[in-house]
Design a protein with these regions (language model features):
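Conserved acidic segment of CheY-like receiver
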Residues: 7-19, 24-28, 38, 57-58
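A short, hydrophobic beta-strand element within the central beta-sheet of small alpha/beta folds
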Residues: 12, 57, 62, 80-95
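Short hydrophobic/Thr-rich beta-strand motif most characteristic of the beta2 strand and flanking loop
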Residues: 33-41, 48
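Conserved phosphotransfer microenvironments
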Residues: 51, 55-82
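Alpha4 helix (beta4-alpha4-beta5 surface) of REC/receiver domains from two-component response regulators
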Residues: 68, 92-108
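C-terminal output helix
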Residues: 114-127, 135
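CheY-like receiver
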Residues: 128-170
Length: 170
């Protein structure tokens, strides 16, 4: 199989400082990503996402400030691409970390150490086969269900949920 061509991609790294940021930038470059912008401040990163086109965002999830980056990005009306893939990069995430990232609108969680192949595979999946986006009163982001499951039991909900919309990028 041919190596994917990511030379035209513009990717943003948010919140990664020093050695961590340099390593992530190196791995993205080794995966073939053509243009990588590294920003430490999440407010500045959101501003840049509103004014420039980016194909994906990698968020270092070690800072409290960057923990809510995905939520802010998904809620921001001025964002040029509200369906942009957002990847959270963790070193040893726990289940609750993954669930929180998912609930904040993160597309996928990546564990460090990360390889160019992992980055390439995750980018390909997010760009070529994106999950549908859900627009609900309390959530906007990729469908949180990793895979579709057939439910054969009865409805156990105690309350009828408020109306949600599935957004499909065409």
């Amino acid at each position: 199989m041919r190596k994917p061509d990511f030379t035209a991609l513009r990717v943003q790294i948010v919140g990664a400082k020093g050695h961590t940021g340099a390593m992530l930038r190196t791995v993205l470059t080794a995966a073939g990503v053509g243009h990588v912008v590294q920003i430490e401040d999440s407010r500045r990163a959101l501003s840049l996402l509103s004014s420039e086109h980016f194909d994906a965002v990698f968020v270092e999830e070690t800072q409290l400030d960057s923990m809510n980056f995905a939520r802010s990005a998904r809620k921001r009306a001025a964002l040029r691409n509200p369906l942009i893939p957002i990847f959270a990069v963790y070193s040893g995430p726990r289940r609750r970390d993954v669930e929180k990232a998912r609930d904040l609108g993160v597309t996928n969680v990546i564990c460090r150490p990360v390889s160019p192949k992992t980055i390439s595979d995750k980018l390909l999946a997010a760009l070529l086969k994106p999950r549908p986006f859900i627009a609900a009163p309390d959530f906007f982001g990729p469908d949180r269900r990793a895979r579709a499951r057939v439910w054969r039991a009865g409805d156990r909900r105690k309350h009828i949920p408020r109306k949600s919309t599935i957004v499909v990028d065409s």
